[in-house]
């Protein structure tokens, strides 16, 4: 199958102009980027940039505030599209990241729109945690003069589907806010629901907010979105895989790969803290197994996004086969009248458990049925790209991007199963083979602007990836700030990822301290949170010296355990109770001194 990438000729800038723009903006702060956006708008309209960046007086019109709370970029894209719709309707709108929002201003909001995703076990995105805590605290103000709407993005394969949006919606109403529209909960395939919701929001707001004068129809407080590139999630770069190296030992229970991808002369840029989006193909053997279990041939024509494709091709390129969901189980049970699965229908907990423990192909194996090709396609979810924390800095690797991939492998009744994207990169892409990629920028996981600022990095397992990028950048910048790494894994001899590199950084004085937790090398299990408590006094000194704290890895257990350890350290060595420690950590988050990249 040939992947079509938009030719550069379609861009309004030639390659040289695009390169100059990228070079000029790559190290600007979000605030500076927002100002530059207003400046260019002012130049275009022959008005001073200051006017373009100044909100209209509140007395003249009630402004609309859109809060974007995004984890992987989808919520941000919906918020940006809504902002553009409202500007087209000549309404005065302000778009802001939840992490930049001064939440004490919420009492003065008249028209408030929240677009949010959900992470972990129903938690809000990292950039919205402080706002979420504030609204659920005793400090939250009454909002009787606020009308609001919430669009919630989620993944129905998780138990706490769209929980963050549900939280914001219920709390805003509880505080006295008036719902402009009922909340919308959108699944992975959110685009159609988002488009319909945006149109309804515009219609609802037209009757609430007077039309702005031309000079006032400008987005203020812009979300961090100015990343100039012809490549995106919907138009990925076709790059080539240059290195696929296993970096765990022969006897390790884990298969972790160091992957290097050659970006060629694409000009694709990224920063430490960003993620690499990977569009993968399903395993042809898995496709064949599923098709045969359903008594199909694979050459049946099916319709995908208005195009007719053979079933095998559609399944390999366009549909999710490695993640089951409660909805899929329920729909399959209803379609096939399976005696095994029908008793689960209506019991959310049992459906979730079955979906989490039984891949789609094994669900079909255990409850065989005959479906036609279109029925199968309608049962499945669209394939979505996987995001991997980038493990390199272009200050060192230039036109490459590195990722650290934990390959998902397991057995179901003796049959080997694997994760879709991780096995694609590890097993099915040959050297110099094509990989479709894009950069998902993450402005909520950034090194300090001041190179003298100390950095504390906590990243067990593959959570170490962005800190490799951080250290490459700090070394290239000759940053004088101290660096401290906490890393953990089961065994020292088998699972010390990038061991030689960390040892070199210590020897060269770039890595000031390193604390290692090997959970299976002794009778008593030791994790990174235990090392945090053990080093509590020194950790508190670093925090008092202005250190930034970064956490990367598992959201469900590790991140919570690490946060609890940090709270205990702050309470003990800061001489405060847990409630005060929680306030202290929340302040660090607001100040961007406590940042997490968890999944």
From Swiss-Prot:
The gene is cysJ. This is Sulfite reductase [NADPH] flavoprotein alpha-component. FMN binds at residues 70-75, 117-120, 153-162. Its cofactor is FAD; FMN. CDD domains: SiR. Residues 234-448 form the FAD-binding FR-type domain. Its EC number is 1.8.1.2. PANTHER family: NADPH OXIDOREDUCTASE A, NITRIC OXIDE SYNTHASE-RELATED. It comes from Shigella boydii serotype 4 (strain Sb227). Alpha(8)-beta(8). The alpha component is a flavoprotein, the beta component is a hemoprotein. FAD binds at residues 322, 356, 386-389, 404-406, 410, 419-422, 599.
